[in-house]
Swiss-Prot record:
Pathway: tRNA modification; tRNA-queuosine biosynthesis. One of its GO terms (cellular component) is cytoplasm. This is Epoxyqueuosine reductase. [4Fe-4S] cluster 1 binds at residues 186, 189, 192, 246. The active site is at 132 (proton donor).
């Protein structure tokens, strides 16, 4: 006879798949002991740059039971965003995750639907949905639940589909069956370390966030340091270099989420189009996109830095 834990686990994983998630793994909620010294060391070395929010909620980042009362399980989910088409080659580049609609809203809707399903099918279950704007170590939880391993570029990797996916969590007060971590398959490969244009991967598995092109083009609010001149390889919003060169991403398959399909302008814009972008065109093109985070001023700053 199937036990309830197994039954509920299978129900949840089946519904996650129906909602379009690539995969679903489950871990027992608790303190992430191995992550505590890593996070502390990373912050002490100021690898978060001006991302001061990374210093907030230190204890909550490591322990989901402080985020959700009586938390029992962390459900980790992956949502593919690998596009079927990429930008015009004569263009300033934006990270592939920003081609379509802002993932925060797309994922939150799916997580809300999954939680509603759990409450309808199983009963009184409390929980919270988390996308990457919340203090949850999403990659650590995804790795703990066997969805992949954390690679030398600090991204979650899988043998089946590489790393072009979003990670999200649902933390609930229900005991479930838990998955086991997988093994690291980076081996002796250093492709990501060798390819990083700004040497942000300072050691295997350690990324200095304050040296990353994504940090400079999205998080940094002041002028980009002049010593970075000529190193950005035309990246105007984010950077995919360490993922593009990863051998496991040869197995990436296009997503099937219509909301992640790009606005045609995103693919067709030339450098001239980007350089001449107006507030009106910016708002029209990126009104539902993660690119709006930089605002028109931030995007123009990035383009001027690349152009000069």
């Amino acid at each position: 006879m199937i036990n309830n834990k197994s039954k509920y686990t299978n129900l949840i994983k089946s519904e996650a798949k129906r909602l379009g998630f690539l995969s679903c793994g489950i871990s027992k909620a608790g303190f992430l002991e191995a992550e505590a010294p890593r996070l502390e060391n990373w912050l002490n070395k100021q690898m978060n740059g001006q991302m001061s929010y990374m210093e907030n909620h230190f204890d909550k980042r490591l322990n989901p039971t402080l985020l959700v009362d009586d938390a029992k399980s962390v459900i980790s989910l992956l949502l593919n965003y690998y596009p079927s088409e990429i930008q015009n080659t004569n263009s300033y580049k934006i990270s592939k995750y920003a081609y379509g609609q802002d993932y925060h809203f797309v994922i939150k809707e799916k997580l809300t639907a999954l939680l509603h399903f759990i409450q309808t099918e199983i009963g009184e279950v409390s929980g919270r949905a988390f996308v990457d704007s919340a203090p949850v170590l999403d990659k650590a939880w995804a790795a703990k639940s066997g969805l992949g391993w954390i690679g030398k570029n600090s991204n979650l990797l899988t043998k089946q589909v590489g790393s072009f996916y979003f990670i999200a969590e649902l933390i609930i007060d229900l005991d479930l069956e838990y998955d086991n971590p997988t093994t690291d398959h980076c081996g002796s490969c250093t492709a990501c370390i060798d390819a990083c244009p700004t040497d942000a991967i300072v050691a295997p598995y350690i990324v200095d966030g304050s040296k990353c092109i994504s940090y400079f083009t999205i998080e940094l609010k002041e002028n980009i340091p002049t010593e970075m001149k000529g190193k950005f390889n035309d990246w105007a919003f984010g950077c995919d270099v360490c993922q593009d060169v990863c051998p496991w991403n040869k197995f990436s398959k296009p997503h099937n989420e219509p909301l992640f399909n790009p606005n045609p302008e995103v693919l067709s814009f030339t450098k001239k189009d980007w350089e001449e972008i107006t507030e009106e065109i910016f708002k029209k093109t990126f009104k539902d996109s993660a690119v709006k985070r930089t605002k028109i001023g931030g995007l123009k700053r990035n383009i001027n830095f690349l152009k000069d």
